[in-house]
């Protein structure tokens, strides 16, 4: 193997230390860069205005024209310029399917002939009437010391009833499974709120509006919590998720049928049904719930905080005032639970971790609502609802 070539010496143009051979001449980087810029000058610009200049004491030229002349005299050659290299940055937009078709990604697969102008209306008036009756009926349960414990007891009772039933594994999620899950989830939320003493003091219109607005966010967190509990007790595997009352799915092995609600395929609707990092965030939230293993009191506060915060932001006005007051009352009850019952003087770290889970779900739901609005603009779905405010995040 030949010995390495060491290029040393002085620059043939200015006499400074050389950095190698540039354009056929041993020169420094400064003179090489200068020649690369100045070689394209026209003849008039190359003429020295003073006649002939000399280099200064430190080897620098006072005249650019004479410096260029010296570069040419020592043999620098413009034919050695390399002009066929790749650009460091390209001004052209990289070609993609979206740029090729000239359509945004979120309507990339939107085929106008599949859009549904005429829609089938799903009437949920019966569900709303059932909810109204449930919220008006008096509770017969013995009330605990405060409403947060009351909600925790209600949640435990609902889950106790389901624990006696065999878990059903769903392999295909279609129209029947979806509508059943929605109905069960909505009525479950109504039952829970009907045992909330401060909530029952609100007027009938306000109670119904809040429940209709927040039931989906409540259900999402409830199923996440229930999944974590069953995984802790070794009743479900890591890839299995609760999706309804006593029903679960294997997230790695299931089929979704959307033919009943849209003319588009699941592949075409990935943008609308999948949020960025949605699956990853949901799995991480389940793991966080497993690690924290919150009590029924803590889970009830999380459910209340997430659902009422969502309802207040969507409804505004007197609903916002009511939800803020309800959350504040339960925050005080949670403080008493930590300090008086658990004897925790400093619980801020644990509460922060619990609230991080609700914020993750809240962000996911917000994205779902925005995508649902886009889908409505382009008539992606072929179904509508008698009470559309209930299904803005589905």
From Swiss-Prot:
Disulfide bonds: none annotated. Pfam families: Hormone_recep, zf-C4. Residues 134-394 form the NR LBD domain. Its main location: nucleus. InterPro entries: C.elegans_Orphan_NR, NHR-like_dom_sf, Nucl_hrmn_rcpt_lig-bd, Znf_hrmn_rcpt, Znf_NHR/GATA. A zinc finger (NR C4-type) spans 11-31, 48-71. It comes from the Eukaryota. GO terms for cellular component: nucleus. GO terms for molecular function: DNA-binding transcription factor activity; sequence-specific DNA binding; zinc ion binding. It is found in: Nucleus. PROSITE patterns: NR_LBD, NUCLEAR_REC_DBD_1, NUCLEAR_REC_DBD_2. Signal peptide: none annotated. Transmembrane segments: none annotated. Keywords: DNA-binding, Metal-binding, Nucleus, Receptor, Transcription, Transcription regulation, Zinc, Zinc-finger. Residues 8-83 bind DNA. Orphan nuclear receptor. Belongs to the nuclear hormone receptor family. This is Nuclear hormone receptor family member nhr-18. It comes from Caenorhabditis elegans. The gene is nhr-18.
């Amino acid at each position: 193997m030949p010995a390495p070539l060491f290029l040393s010496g002085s620059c043939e143009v200015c006499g400074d230390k050389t950095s190698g051979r540039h354009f056929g001449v041993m020169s420094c980087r400064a003179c090489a860069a200068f020649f690369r810029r100045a070689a394209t000058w026209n003849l008039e610009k190359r003429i020295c205005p003073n006649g002939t200049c000399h280099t200064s004491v430190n080897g620098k030229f006072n005249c650019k024209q004479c410096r260029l002349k010296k570069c040419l005299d020592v043999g620098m050659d413009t034919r050695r310029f390399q002009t066929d290299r790749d650009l460091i940055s390209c001004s052209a937009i990289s070609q993609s399917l979206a740029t090729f078709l000239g359509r945004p990604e979120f309507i990339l697969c939107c085929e106008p002939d599949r859009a549904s102008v005429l829609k089938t209306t799903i009437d949920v008036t019966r569900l709303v009437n059932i909810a109204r009756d449930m919220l008006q009926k008096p509770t017969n349960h013995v009330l605990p010391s405060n409403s947060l414990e009351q909600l925790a007891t209600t949640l435990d009772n609902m889950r106790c009833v389901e624990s006696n039933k065999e878990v059903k594994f769903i392999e295909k999620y279609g129209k029947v499974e979806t509508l059943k899950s929605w109905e069960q989830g909505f009525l479950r939320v109504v039952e829970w709120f009907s045992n909330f003493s401060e909530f029952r003091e609100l007027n009938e219109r306000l109670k119904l509006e809040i429940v209709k607005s927040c039931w989906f966010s409540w259900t999402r967190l409830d199923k996440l919590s229930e999944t974590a509990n069953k995984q802790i007790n070794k009743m479900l595997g890591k890839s299995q998720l609760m999706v309804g009352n006593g029903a679960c799915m294997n997230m790695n092995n299931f089929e979704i049928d959307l033919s009943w609600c849209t003319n588009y395929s699941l592949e075409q609707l990935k943008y609308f049904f999948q949020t960025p990092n949605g699956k990853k965030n949901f799995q991480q939230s389940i793991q966080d719930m497993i690690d924290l293993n919150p009590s029924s009191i803590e889970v009830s506060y999380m459910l209340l905080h997430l659902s009422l915060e969502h309802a207040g932001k969507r409804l505004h006005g007197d609903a916002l005032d009511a939800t803020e007051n309800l959350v504040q009352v339960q925050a005080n009850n949670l403080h008493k639970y930590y300090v008086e019952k658990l004897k925790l003087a400093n619980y801020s770290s644990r509460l922060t971790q619990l609230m991080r889970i609700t914020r993750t779900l809240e962000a996911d739901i917000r994205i779902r609502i925005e995508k649902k609005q886009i889908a409505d603009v382009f008539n992606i779905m072929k179904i509508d609802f008698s009470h559309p405010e209930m299904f803005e995040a589905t």
